[in-house]
């Protein structure tokens, strides 16, 4: 009896083994592990690629931001240098006008810059007075030494000489006063002209500096806006690249997920088919065994 059951079990196993060769091949545990390892490797590669692209986009953004900052710094320094040059030009222009005014005053008065106008006028007055005195003395000598003239004629000549001497002195005083007044007026006119020219030059330089300052501010604002635009563009590029990499990674993961799902379904179908075949084989074996047992029982009775 025990040998009969052993034979039955051996027969069932043999039939099941033969039947299994007719169905689809079932993936083993090692194959599942290899598939999982491949899937994991591809996922890691996709993740590394995503990280690499993200880092590359960050580096590009940093490079563009640094370039924009350097450009803003360069434009600001250029504007500062230009403003300094304008201030220097304005100073030189003002000094040039002042020097020109001094020279014109000296030329208008007829003496050099290092001469004293008041001293020159006094020297001219002293020269005229000295000439008048010498003329008076000479006339007195002529009056006293002219014996052929009468006393009256001599007196008239003396009086005339005195009168002419006084006229010369008065004329010299008047001329000196006129020269002094003319000199003062000329000096005042030249000083006013120099002051006006210097003021004009100062106003022009001030306007030029203001215009340059406005231009500097405008250039700085433009550079800042340009830098902001470039940074925003770089940021958008980074976002687009990151989004594209994420979508690509998601797509690959979905494709791998579908492949793994298909493999699992295929394995399940193979397992179900094998199980069904095995059950059919067992039932058939049971029927065969039962028929053989009944046949032996009938033969034994007979």
UniProtKB/Swiss-Prot annotation:
Which GO biological process annotations does it have? response to water deprivation
Basic and acidic residues compositional bias: what residue ranges? 34-70, 79-93, 205-286
Disulphide bond pairs: none
Q: Where does the record place the region Disordered?
A: 25-93, 168-193, 205-302
Q: Please tell me what else the database record remarks about this protein.
A: This is a SET 5a protein.
Q: Which family does it belong to?
A: Belongs to the LEA type 1 family.
Q: What does this protein do?
A: LEA protein are late embryonic proteins abundant in higher plant seed embryos. There are two subsets of LEA proteins (5a and 5b), the first ones are expressed when the cotyledon weight reach 80 mg and the second set are expressed above 100 mg. The function of those proteins is not known.
The name of this protein is Late embryogenesis abundant protein D-29
């Amino acid at each position: 009896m025990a040998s009969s059951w052993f034979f039955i079990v051996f027969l069932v196993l043999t039939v099941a083994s033969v039947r299994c060769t007719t169905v689809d091949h079932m993936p083993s545990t090692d194959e599942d592990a290899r598939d999982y390892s491949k899937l994991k490797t591809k996922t890691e590669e996709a993740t590394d690629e995503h990280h690499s692209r993200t880092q590359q986009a960050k580096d590009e953004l940093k490079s563009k931001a640094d370039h924009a900052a350097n450009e803003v710094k360069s434009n600001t320094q250029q504007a500062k240098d230009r403003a300094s040059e304008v201030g220097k030009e304005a100073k030189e222009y003002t000094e040039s006008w002042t020097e020109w005014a001094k020279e014109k005053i000296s030329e208008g008065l007829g003496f050099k810059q290092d001469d004293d106008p008041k001293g020159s006028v006094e020297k001219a007055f002293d020269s005229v007075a000295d000439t008048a005195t010498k003329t008076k003395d000479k006339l007195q000598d002529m009056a006293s030494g002219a014996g052929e003239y009468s006393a009256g004629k001599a007196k008239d000549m003396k009086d005339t000489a005195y009168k002419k001497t006084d006229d010369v002195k008065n004329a010299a005083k008047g001329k000196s006063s006129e020269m002094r007044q003319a000199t003062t007026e000329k000096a005042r006119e030249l000083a006013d002209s120099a002051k006006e020219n210097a003021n004009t030059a100062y106003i022009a330089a001030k306007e030029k500096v203001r215009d340059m300052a406005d231009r500097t501010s405008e250039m700085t604002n433009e550079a800042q806006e340009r830098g902001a635009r470039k940074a925003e563009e770089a940021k958008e590029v980074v976002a687009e690249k990151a989004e594209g990499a994420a979508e690509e990674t998601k797509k690959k993961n979905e494709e791998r997920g579908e492949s793994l799902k298909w493999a699992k379904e295929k394995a399940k179908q193979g397992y179900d088919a094998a199980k069904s075949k095995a059950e059919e084989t067992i039932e058939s074996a049971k029927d065969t065994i039962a028929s053989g047992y009944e046949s032996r029982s009938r033969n034994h009775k007979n």
